[in-house]
């Protein structure tokens, strides 16, 4: 059993992936070991770093018994974490970091520390959207991206076809704007064939009425899930209204923090598939609690993981630790050098994530330096 942990140092490293994407990592040390955690949070990543610097100043003089004690040690209330994503990301980082450091103290891998049995691999689904963030978002481009993912061995593919919709529009205008998105999904379905499952992420573009119409169109294409037609952190009641009236399971929750948030969504019928993100939900151990709770209440879990290889490894460990977990998300074709920034390199083959020895990896700073990045405090 690991002793109480005291964080003694913190440093950061970021890498530019595309014009729209930067991955940022934090390294926490207790003086004898280090733990690498991804803190990518879009335009709020700078605030996450500031929150972490402030928090570590406190934790350097305070021993923490477990990751569950972090928020209390910092005097942070759950309401703050549920309403401030950058703060939730910082606290999630600290909680994941302490879980990892204590696993190292105990001489066990992270999967075991999370209550699971070590595995060779876990199944993935391909998120093709990260490779389609530029200007070429024609149905043909979606079809080619889906076909490429299927050729790489993925039998589940997710797309986000509605990203050019303004969610503030009227229902009529939302439905008009959704037509091209539905055409994109149809193109993916046609390209990959009936034996590949297709998932759709709506990125909270719709209102209640437009959600129901779009769901009906997508049902005709045989999609596997309907992800966040409405933002669950903003309108869980509206999402529950939709979920109770569509034929496919509703998934979501990627921005939520804490087991209580997800349990409420499941209990009110807003989602059937919980999608915690280890970067935001409270960390790896909290993600396991969220997933096990969902499975026990006739729901399912699929970890949200559209970012870099550091959070991918952590998310794979969580997936491996939860019996009955669904396939894990993997963003395909965003950067050709993605796997090389870890040592050992990330291994994705035949639609599966293959664990490195000990289910752990470090940043390859030689490769990182080739992209003009280095550690900063």
Give each language-model segment a name.
Residues 2-41, 337-339:
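Structured beta-strand/loop patches that form or line metal/cofactor-binding pockets in enzymes
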Residues 17, 38-46, 127-133:
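Glycine-rich phosphate/pyrophosphate-binding beta-alpha loops
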Residues 32, 94, 107, 157, ...:
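Conserved, mostly hydrophobic/aromatic
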Residues 33-108:
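Metal- or metallocofactor-binding catalytic centers and their adjacent structured scaffolds
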Residues 37, 122-126, 155-159, 198-202, ...:
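Hydrophobic faces of well-ordered beta-strands that scaffold small-molecule active sites
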Residues 69, 216, 222, 231-252, ...:
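Shared catalytic-loop signature of beta/alpha-barrel
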Residues 89, 94-135:
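Glycine-rich, aromatic-flanked loop segments that form ligand/cofactor-binding clefts
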Residues 121, 125-239, 245:
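Metal-dependent enolase-superfamily TIM-barrel catalytic cores that perform enediolate-based chemistry
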């Amino acid at each position: 059993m690991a002793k109480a942990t005291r964080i003694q140092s913190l440093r950061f490293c970021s890498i530019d992936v595309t014009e729209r994407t930067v991955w940022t990592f934090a390294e926490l040390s207790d003086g004898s070991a280090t733990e690498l955690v991804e803190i990518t949070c879009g335009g709020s990543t700078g605030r996450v770093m500031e929150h972490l610097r402030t928090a570590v100043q406190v934790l350097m003089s305070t021993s923490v018994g477990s990751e569950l004690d972090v928020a209390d040690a910092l005097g942070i209330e759950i309401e703050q974490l549920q309403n401030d994503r950058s703060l939730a990301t910082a606290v999630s980082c600290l909680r994941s970091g302490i879980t990892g450091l204590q696993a190292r103290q105990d001489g066990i891998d992270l999967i075991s520390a999370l209550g699971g049995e070590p595995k060779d691999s876990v199944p993935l689904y391909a998120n093709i959207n990260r490779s389609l963030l530029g200007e070429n978002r024609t149905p043909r481009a979606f079809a080619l991206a889906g076909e490429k993912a299927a050729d790489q061995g993925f039998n589940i593919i997710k797309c986000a076809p509605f990203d050019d919709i303004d969610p503030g529009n009227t229902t009529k205008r939302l439905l008009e704007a959704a037509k091209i998105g539905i055409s994109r999904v149809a193109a993916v379905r046609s390209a990959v064939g009936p034996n590949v499952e297709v998932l759709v992420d709506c990125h909270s573009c719709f209102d209640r009425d437009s959600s129901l119409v779009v769901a009906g169109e997508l049902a005709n294409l045989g999609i596997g899930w309907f992800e966040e037609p409405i933002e669950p952190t903003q309108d869980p009641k509206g999402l529950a209204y939709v979920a109770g009236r569509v034929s496919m399971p509703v998934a979501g929750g990627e921005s939520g923090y804490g087991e209580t948030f997800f349990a409420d969504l499941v209990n009110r019928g807003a989602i059937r598939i919980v999608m915690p993100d280890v970067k935001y939900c409270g960390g790896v151990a909290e993600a396991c609690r969220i997933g096990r709770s969902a499975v026990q209440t006739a729901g399912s879990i699929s970890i949200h993981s559209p970012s870099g290889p550091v959070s991918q490894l952590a998310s794979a460990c969580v997936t491996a630790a939860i019996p009955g977990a669904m396939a894990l998300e993997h963003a395909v074709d965003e950067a050709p050098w993605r796997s090389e920034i870890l040592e050992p390199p990330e291994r994705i083959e035949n639609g599966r994530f293959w664990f490195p020895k000990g289910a752990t990896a470090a940043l390859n700073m030689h490769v990182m330096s080739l992209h003009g990045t280095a550690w900063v405090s």
